A protein has these predicted regions:
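A short beta-loop-alpha structural element at the N-terminal edge
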Residues: 4-18
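Conserved GNAT-fold acetyl-CoA-binding loop/helix
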Residues: 18-46
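A short helix-loop-beta-strand connector motif used in the catalytic cores of GNAT acetyltransferases and
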Residues: 44-58
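Conserved beta-strand in the GNAT
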Residues: 58, 64-72, 79-84
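Conserved acetyl-CoA pyrophosphate-binding loop and the N-cap/start of the following alpha-helix
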Residues: 89, 93-101
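Conserved beta-strand-loop-alpha-helix junction that forms the acyl-donor binding cleft
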Residues: 90, 113-124, 140-141
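Conserved active-site alpha-helix within GNAT-family acetyltransferase domains
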Residues: 96-97, 104, 118-137
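Terminal substrate-recognition subdomain of acyl/acetyltransferases
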Residues: 140-151
Length: 151
C-alpha cells in the first residue's frame, strides 16, 4: 500500500465522480432512505468545477484513485465539504489516512469543520473517533469541529 493524498486536476474528475457516486449511494446501507448524495456528487460538471477551483483532492493507492475530498480553506479555517472512499476500500484505514493528511496539509488551520447527516451512523462514529466534536445539529445534519492551537 503506497498512499498519497494529492490535489486533483480536471483529468481526475471522471474517476472521482464515479467513486463519489458509489460511495454516497452505499449510504442506503447505513440509514439513507434511498440512493443519493450531496449536491453534485454524481455529476462530471461539478467535479470538474471543483478541480478548477482547486478544492478537489484525490486519494491514490499505487497509482489508482480510491477516494477523494472537497476542501474549502478560508483564513485559518478549513471546511471538509466531503470525503469519500470507494466502497471496495471501506474499513481499510483509507478514510483515517485521508483525514490525517488533510489536517497535516494545512498546519496554519486552527479550526476544521464538517457536517454529516444525522442518520449516517457510519460517518458520525468515524468523525467522533477522529476527535471531532459536535457543535450543533439541526433537523438533518450534525455539525462537527476540531480545533487546534497552532502557536
Amino acid at each position: 500500500m503506497s498512499l498519497q493524498f494529492l490535489k486533483a486536476g480536471t483529468a481526475d474528475a471522471v474517476s472521482l465522480m464515479c467513486i463519489s457516486k458509489k460511495a454516497f449511494d452505499s449510504d442506503v446501507e447505513v440509514g439513507a432512505s434511498s440512493v443519493g448524495g450531496p449536491p453534485g456528487y454524481a455529476t462530471l460538471s461539478f467535479h470538474t468545477k471543483m478541480a478548477r477551483m482547486n478544492c478537489l483532492y484525490k486519494l491514490v493507492d499505487d497509482y489508482k484513485i480510491v477516494g477523494g475530498a472537497l476542501l474549502f480553506l478560508k483564513d485559518n479555517e478549513l471546511n471538509v465539504g466531503r470525503i469519500f472512499v470507494d466502497p471496495e476500500y471501506f474499513r481499510k484505514g483509507y478514510g483515517i489516512f485521508m483525514m490525517q493528511q488533510i489536517e497535516a496539509m494545512f498546519p496554519q488551520v486552527k479550526t476544521f469543520s464538517l457536517d454529516t447527516p444525522i442518520w449516517n451512523v457510519r460517518t458520525n462514529a468515524f468523525y467522533q473517533k477522529l476527535g471531532y466534536v459536535e457543535v450543533r445539529r439541526d433537523g438533518d445534519f450534525v455539525y462537527y469541529e476540531k480545533r487546534r492551537d497552532t502557536e
